[in-house]
Amino acid sequence: MRKITLVIMAAGMGSRFGGLKQIEPIDPEGHIIIDFSLFDAWRAGFRDVVFIIKREMEAEFQECIGDRMERYFHVSYVYQDLDRLPEGIEVPEGRTKPWGTGHALACCKGVVNGPFAVINADDFYGRTAFSEIYDFLAAQTDESKYAMVGYRLKNTVTEFGSVARGVCEIEDGMLTGVTERTKIFKKGADAEYTEDGEHFFPLAGDTIVSMNLWGFSARVLDELWARMGAFLTEAMKTNPLKCEYFLPFVVNEQLADKSASVQVLPCEETWYGVTYREDLASVKEAVARMKAEGIYTEELWK
């Protein structure tokens, strides 16, 4: 059976809280969101996990998360170093911000050599999402065929402020494009987005969005590197300290030049995350409810 890897983008994990040890648990047993993702991934069939982290957080990450997971997974680490860039590109003076999700994933080249799924560390995706992506990858032999788990926008927003989501265009179950909207606000059963804080545009609650749960072949890592230089050269002309190389940028380019296709795997799960401190109570309530329903045991892994 082919090895299918779970890649977790965790370089920014804990930054809002002053460190990993300051992340508040979401249940009385002390679990944080990534614990549930790892548990769901294990149940789906994943046995290899790669954590993308900052080099300086490795010891704390191993202590808080990595060492515990070595009982269940083969664990590897990838560093998202600011200066790991294509030849000819240099870090602008004063730049401290990471280069974005596309760069994070590109750093896995040489470590991930087969099919893999990728997730954010601080999003709660739900059990079925991992089963769907694992089953797709297990059955797929064409390296140009990717997948994305698609959520309904109404299941991924918060009452407490804006969220960033990849708004998807879909035809016959296949992704035709994804647009990053960085300021989406809940509005009743629907939502609206703004680019400038003044003009707002409606989005239907049933709109399918990406939560960065993708299934790829290792070929995408070559694509990410091949396209990064041109993107950053152009982006740094106008925004050298803050521009980001987002993963959907490369997916869109591959869709446009027909070097890849992306099947959308619909998911009716509700997303949970602590985008805002006020979100914590609803996440805790949801976890308690799922435990009461038997979806999770009180103590994971027992």
Regions found by a protein language model. Give the residues of each.
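Hydrophobic helical membrane-anchoring modules
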Residues: 257-261, 269-302
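A C-terminal functional module that forms or caps the active site or interfaces directly
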Residues: 225-260
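A conserved hydrophobic position in a structured secondary element of the catalytic/binding core
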Residues: 53, 215-216, 275
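Conserved core of the sugar-phosphate nucleotidyltransferase
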Residues: 127-214, 218
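A structural signal for short hydrophobic beta-strand segments in well-ordered beta-sheet cores
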Residues: 23, 167-170, 264
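Phosphate- and divalent-cation-binding pockets in alpha/beta enzyme and binding domains
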Residues: 60-61, 128, 223, 250, ...
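Conserved N-terminal catalytic core of the sugar/cofactor nucleotidyltransferase
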Residues: 1-11, 28-118, 125-126, 130, ...
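Short, surface-exposed amphipathic charged segments that create phosphate/polyanion-binding patches used
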Residues: 87-98, 161-166, 278-282
